[in-house]
Structures are given as C-alpha cells and as structure tokens.
UniProtKB/Swiss-Prot annotation:
One of its GO terms (biological process) is methionine biosynthetic process. This is Bifunctional protein FolD. Catalyzes the oxidation of 5,10-methylenetetrahydrofolate to 5,10-methenyltetrahydrofolate and then the hydrolysis of 5,10-methenyltetrahydrofolate to 10-formyltetrahydrofolate. Homodimer. NADP(+) binds at G166, R167, S168, S191, I232. The keyword Hydrolase applies. It comes from Phenylobacterium zucineum (strain HLK1). It holds the Pfam family THF_DHG_CYH. It comes from the Bacteria. GO terms for cellular component: cytosol. GO terms for molecular function: methenyltetrahydrofolate cyclohydrolase activity; methylenetetrahydrofolate dehydrogenase (NADP+) activity.
Length: 297
C-alpha cells in the first residue's frame, strides 16, 4: 500500500482563494478592508523570508498589509510602544510579531501586550484559554492548518483516535484542543512518554510536532492511519558527497519514505503543513476583522 500524499500547495491555494473572495465581499458590502501588520525585529534570514511571504500573500488576497522592520537592538519599551499603536489603529485587524525575537527582548511580555482581538497568531493567553474552554478564539495558524487538512482528507473526525506527539503551546496543545472539539479521542504524547511507538500505533490520526528529524518510523504507524507531519528540520543530505559540501535539506519529524508504505495518507515536508500556515494567518485576519466590525458569518 502506498499512502495518499496530502498536497499542502493545493489546499493552501484553495484557502487563499476563499479568503480573497471574502475580502472582496467585505470591501464591497461593508467597505471593510482587513489589515495585517507584521513586526520583524532584527535580520534573521529565515524570519525575513517568512515575513516577506506573509506580506506578499496578504496583498495578493486584497488585504491592507504593513510590515514594520526594526533593528536588532530595539528596546523592549520601543517594541511595546509599537504594539500599543497597532492595537489602537482602526485599519489594522491582525498583529503578528515574528518569532523568535532577539534574546534581550521578553517574548511573553510582547505577546501579552497584543490585543487578544488582533492576536492572529493565537498565542495570547486569552485566546489559549478560550480555545481550551471551547469558546470562539483566534487559533494558532499551524494547528488550524492541520485540522483543515484532516477534514479535507477524512471528512467527519468523530470518534477517531488521535495521537499528538509534542506538547508545545504553538502546536501540540492547541491541535489537541481542536481535535477534542472535533470529537476525537485524543492522547498527547511527548519525549517522556513510555513506549511511544506503541502509543503511536493506536492512532487513526497521528500528528507529529516534536522537532526531531525522522523520529517517527514506519513501524510506529497504524496501517491506514492519517499522518500530519508538522516538523521542519534541516539535516545534511544522505548523499555523502553533497553532505561533505555542507548541503542540507528539509525533513519532517516522520520518516517519510517508511510512512508512505504504511499510512493511508501523509503530509510531505516540504510541501505540506507549512504551506497552510500562511493561508490560515490570512483567514485569521479576516476572522478578526469581521469580529472587530461586528459582522456575522
């Protein structure tokens, strides 16, 4: 059996199309243009790529988009002042501070300063609490992308046994909450879980978000299970010649080639969950704009 490959590119393009249609409707019917502000502190190359992508995609769907690039030596009070200005700006409905921040800045304090109504990363404690309580919330983008991919692949998730490997605030815990709300039976596993392979083998849905390259092997996967690989790990090429040249590639937390022989469906890395994350950021910005404007539906 060869698993179905869940194509993140196709799903992300579809979601961006839906967002663009909704933005056009809001602009036509309500004269409301959803606005996203992205804040980048420092010059981390990966963060610059992510921020540029977010800006380009938000403009492409018709949103108002602003990027604030601050020097690496920006003080905490300066960053908090900018966040306060964005909180008060009626043209901005979503605020995203690109993480990680330089080490001298307090990430938790910065996230806490963002208005929960504009927290499109879904990291504010208010949104985390609302999600855990089953109340409407802005949900972290990667877990939201995982849920969309699962529903596209499986339809109704009711009664499925789901195992989430990883307990981070960014992915593991929120994706578990979303799966619970979808009426799955959920287990959160992690590096200290006893007999982790056996726990994984119980899963109809296996979400890997542990940050260890190719940790989850094919014989950890229940035949026919749906595997969502959130991991993004840079490793040397298997080819010794390329590895000797310092060349690297991206792999997930799942051993992809082995998973293909066992799973019913699996997301690739790259080309899977990562592509959904930016699309879900756009969706969250539209959701925030509608809630702030009191627009239903």
């Amino acid at each position: 059996m060869t698993a179905k490959i869940i194509d993140g590119k196709v799903l992300a393009e579809r979601l961006r199309g839906q967002v663009a249609d909704e933005v056009a409707r809001l602009r036509a019917d309500y004269r409301l243009q959803p606005g996203l502000a992205v804040v980048l502190v420092g010059e981390d190359p990966a963060s610059q790529v992510y921020v540029r992508s977010k800006g380009e995609h938000s403009l492409a769907v018709g949103m108002h988009s602003v990027t604030h690039r601050l020097p690496a030596d920006t003080r905490q009070d300066e960053l908090l002042r900018l966040v306060a200005e964005l909180n008060a700006d009626p043209l901005i409905h979503g605020i995203l501070v690109q993480l990680p921040l330089p080490k001298h800045l307090d990430e938790k304090a910065v996230i806490a300063a963002i208005s929960p109504d504009k927290d499109v990363d879904g990291l504010h404690v208010v949104n985390a609490g609302r999600l855990a309580s089953g109340l409407p919330a802005l949900v972290p983008c990667t877990p939201l992308g995982c849920l969309i991919m699962l529903r596209e692949t499986l339809g109704d998730l009711t009664g499925k046994r789901a195992v989430v490997v990883g307990r981070s605030l960014l992915v593991g815990k929120p994706v578990a909450q979303l799966l619970l709300q979808a009426d799955c039976t959920v287990t959160i596993a992690h590096s200290r879980t006893v007999d982790l392979p056996a726990v994984c083998r119980e899963a109809d849905i296996l979400v890997a978000a542990v940050g260890r390259p190719r940790m989850i092997r094919g014989d950890w996967i229940k035949p026919g299970a749906t595997v969502i690989d959130v991991g993004i790990n840079r490793v040397p090429f298997d080819d010794p010649e390329k590895a000797a040249q310092g060349k690297t590639k991206l792999v997930g937390d799942v051993h992809y080639k082995e998973a293909l022989q066992v799973a019913g469906a699996v997301t690739p890395v790259p080309g899977g969950v990562g592509l959904m994350t930016v699309a879900c950021l756009l969706q969250n910005t539209v959701t925030a704009a509608k809630r702030l404007a009191g627009i239903e539906g």
